[in-house]
């Protein structure tokens, strides 16, 4: 990913009608750990089946009602990991259900490359990564300011990603380098100095 990346700020309403898994289970008095675990796993399964993409798509339509007729194309605009991110948020804090939260989502890697003009726009459709409809939609939203190019702070905080190139970062490399330097400073150098003194 580059230092600048396409993203969009979306008002996400955690609609109780869509997140219909019920409240997070708590262990009842007299309930065995196995029974509680069964109920909790069932709740997790229901949460996993929620259409999290619909929350983002609904937020985009709420921000720009003219997008209602292009609903099927909207999920192509953002990276696939964003739906899992809002799912994990609700897992950690179920009180979000029923609330509206302004969230920033990374655009899909192909959208980002298209808007950065790193793809030859004169190529025929069969050589493009995006459909003509999605290309036009991304251009329209960029012109309206719905999709913006912002500084990519996640480049420094995210680990590598095999499934979502747009969210790949350098955090893993930084941590690996840090631990290597700590090993060198606290183990390798003292051992080297001690060996030199001994010899």
What residue ranges belong to the model's regions?
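Hydrophobic alpha-helical transmembrane segments of small proteolipidic membrane proteins, enriched
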Residues: 1-2, 182
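Membrane-topology segments of multi-pass transport proteins
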Residues: 2-166
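Short hydrophobic/aromatic segments of transmembrane alpha-helices and their interfaces
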Residues: 79-80, 177-178, 189-190
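Generic hydrophobic, aliphatic-rich segments that mediate packing or membrane embedding
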Residues: 152, 170, 194-195
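Alpha-helical membrane-interface segments at transmembrane helix boundaries
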Residues: 164-179, 183
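Transmembrane-helix boundary motif in ABC transporter permease subunits
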Residues: 184-199
